[in-house]
């Protein structure tokens, strides 16, 4: 199945991740990291809860739980102005989470390109997503994500 048509289901956990084109850098300084998180909060937090994340110079990982169907519907109606007439295709309620994540990635990429006078894609497309289907997998994934930076530094406290 094409990952682009894979629906992110309400009340389910997912591993969301991506990397720079050809493994290239997506964060050059602290301001980039902070802006990335600000955009994540703006676009993704309204539709998901976050359980873990890791931002690395060339990639990122998030463990998220999609909010309930009722919460997503409330967001879609009140924030995205979803109506019966425009509730189809990419604008359908079942696509609201993917759409918000795509807006987040696009907003960060456009800003990064403007700041660094570059053009074209910054991140591989589409963003990667994997449904977390067990508590054991969730626990191991959170450990993996939190330990990801230790490969860069011997002492994680200085990362």
Language model features: what each stretch is:
Residues 1-159:
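Short catalytic/metal-binding and nucleic-acid-binding patches
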């Amino acid at each position: 199945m094409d990952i682009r048509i894979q629906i992110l289901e309400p009340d389910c956990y997912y591993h969301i991740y991506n990397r720079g084109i050809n493994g290239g850098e997506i964060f050059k300084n602290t301001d980039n990291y902070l802006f990335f998180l600000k955009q994540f909060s703006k676009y993704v937090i309204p539709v998901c809860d976050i359980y873990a994340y890791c931002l690395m110079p060339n990639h990122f990982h998030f463990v998220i739980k999609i909010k309930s169907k009722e919460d997503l519907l409330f967001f879609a109606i009140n924030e995205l102005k979803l109506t019966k007439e425009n509730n189809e295709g990419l604008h359908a309620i079942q696509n609201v989470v993917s759409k918000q994540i795509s807006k987040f990635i696009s907003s960060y990429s456009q800003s990064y390109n403007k700041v660094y006078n570059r053009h074209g894609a910054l991140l591989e497309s589409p963003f990667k997503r994997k449904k977390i289907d067990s508590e054991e997998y969730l626990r191991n994934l959170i450990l993996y994500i939190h330990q990801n930076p230790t490969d860069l530094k011997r002492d994680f406290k200085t990362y």
